[in-house]
From Swiss-Prot:
Localization per record: Golgi apparatus membrane
Annotated motif DXD motif, positions: 192-194
Pathway: Glycolipid biosynthesis
Residues bearing attached sugar chains per UniProt: 121, 203
UniProt-recorded name of the protein: Lactosylceramide 4-alpha-galactosyltransferase
Length: 353
């Protein structure tokens, strides 16, 4: 049996009052750690109550799909989606995100990088989402190798170190790191998998969206390959790393770097400087996260174009909205967005939800 550390033994040999305090602190920390571990590993993330689990593995492809772009593989100008967990069964919002991007960008490769996909010549998993997205010839699903992605970037050593420890927000932090590495290495457009794309985004370069008057958001990024702004983001990611604060490596990082980039103290002072532009909230975040329930409220279909006239893509705030049920054929805003911008996914929802 291994001996306790010398420091712990010295603490326990102290005065009775000191021993009681020491034991209390050790017990509290141990209980707190065990509670978090049990919650994270046993309870896990909330189930998606709005999606059934007896879905078919395949779906007939629609007759009309975007044409196949001529090139193959990651090249500048691609549209990227990321799944940094091991999940390989895209939900309906994930499907709609990719389909809407594919339909609005028929000339582009839409690359869905999934950590859980097998490498080599292995076939794709048999899931409804994989089958549906395979219908679009400009959509390509590829395995995500994080070690390879971070290689030759400031993130490589950080990734090697973080493998050996537990952190509460590791999955979103990995996603934050992956998107800036993708933009640095390949350039193009990055989108979270809870976006619904309304318009072509090809005219946006070196652009990110404003979430509120105080913070930017990296759920959408559009940058040239090896842009210095992304290099600064990677360096800040490592130099000021804190995986225990939600958003510190994502929205807060982008906000910090943009303020340094423009030498400003407030986002209100500048929306564009040194070739990098921030778009107002209505461009990508027309409904604030605090009002996410509005996506499930009925609206008049005639009001939709007016409401979204200044919007490129709609962020649905899946962290808040996941599990919320709605009828695919209803007049809810989200149902109407599905019907208009991802009709193939919408048909599947009507059949299986």
């Amino acid at each position: 049996m291994s001996k306790p550390p010398d420091l712990l033994l010295r603490l326990l040999r102290g005065a009775p009052r000191q021993r009681v305090c020491t034991l209390f602190i050790i017990g509290f920390k141990f209980t707190f750690f065990v509670s978090i571990m049990i919650y994270w590993h046993v309870v896990g993330e909330p189930k998606e109550k709005g999606q059934l689990y007896n879905l078919p593995a395949e779906i007939p492809c629609p007759t009309l799909t975007p044409p196949t772009p001529p090139s193959h593989g990651p090249t500048p100008g691609n549209i990227f989606f990321l799944e940094t967990s091991d999940r390989t069964n895209p939900n309906f919002l994930f499907m709609c995100s990719v389909e809407s991007a594919a339909r609005t960008h028929p000339e582009s490769h839409v690359l869905v990088l999934m950590k859980g996909l097998p490498g080599g010549n292995a076939s794709l998993p048999r899931h409804l989402g994989i089958s549906l997205l395979s219908c679009f010839p400009n959509v390509q699903m590829l395995p995500l190798d994080l070690r390879e992605l971070f290689q030759d970037t400031p993130l490589a050593d950080w990734y090697a170190a973080v493998q050996g420890r537990w952190e509460p927000y590791l999955l979103p932090v990995l996603s934050d790191a992956s998107r800036i590495a993708l933009m640095w290495k390949f350039g193009g457009i990055y989108l979270d998998t809870d976006f619904i794309v309304l318009k072509n985004l090809r005219n946006l370069t070196n652009v990110l969206g404003t979430q509120s008057r105080y913070v930017l958001n990296g759920a959408f990024l559009a940058f040239e390959r090896r842009h210095e702004f992304m290099a600064l983001c990677m360096r800040d990611f490592v130099d000021h790393y804190n995986g225990w604060i939600w958003g510190h490596q994502g929205p807060q990082l982008l906000t910090r770097v943009f303020k340094k980039w423009c030498s400003i103290r407030s986002l209100a002072e500048s929306r564009s400087c040194r070739g990098v532009t921030t778009l107002p909230p209505e461009a990508f975040y027309p409904i604030p996260w605090q009002d996410w329930k509005k996506y499930f409220e009925d609206i008049n279909p005639e009001e939709l174009p007016r409401l979204l006239s200044a919007t490129y893509a709609v962020h649905v705030w899946n962290k808040k909205s996941q599990g919320t049920r709605f009828e695919a054929t209803s007049r809810a805003l989200l149902a109407q967005l599905h019907a208009r911008y991802c009709p193939t996914t919408h048909e599947a929802m009507k059949m299986y939800l």
